Amino acid sequence: MKRSVKQLLVTVFSIVTLGYIASISAHESPRVILDPEGNNPSFLAYASVSCFDDGNGAPDSMVISVQDFSAPQANLLVSAQVIGKFHAAQTTDLVSGDGGYSAEVRVHEGAGPYLLLINKSGHGTREFVLTYHCLTIDGIHTGTNDPMVIQFQ
């Protein structure tokens, strides 16, 4: 009996610890409906995120990926762009609704603000999640502010 209680406590502690580690090392938007009416092919979500040294080290880069939860629709994909002071990168979820994310892309511009854009390729509603991380030069997660939405239309 004592052994099973100990095993249970170890399991619970491991799950709680892993959940805590995941929560401090990943940033993910909630599910968002892009173009709720479905009638604006140029609908754009635009936000700003800042990277800073939270004690884990100076930021080197911003990494993003996007996941489209919507059912597949011909010629309708969700893309995300990250824009620094001098560089930008773009990624697209090529298979909507498959449970997978787009390829990660990265812009190396250190601390400060990064602009994030999410758009779609045509008419229709899309439901997406964006992941975003500030990383040190060694790939360690460092300070990442919550996005400040600038435009959603």
Show where each model-derived region lies.
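Short, surface-exposed beta-strand/strand-loop-strand elements in extracellular ectodomains
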Residues: 72-92
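Non-catalytic extracellular/lumenal accessory regions of secreted precursors
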Residues: 23-52, 136-153
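Short, surface-exposed binding/anchoring microloops in extracellular/periplasmic proteins
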Residues: 39-77
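Bacterial N-terminal signal peptides
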Residues: 11-20
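Noncatalytic modules at the cell exterior or secretory-pathway interfaces
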Residues: 60-62, 107-127
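Bacterial N-terminal signal peptides that target proteins for export
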Residues: 2-12
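Edge beta-strands of jelly-roll/beta-sandwich modules across compartments, strongly enriched
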Residues: 45-47, 76-78, 114, 122-149
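Beta-sandwich interaction modules
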Residues: 53, 98-109
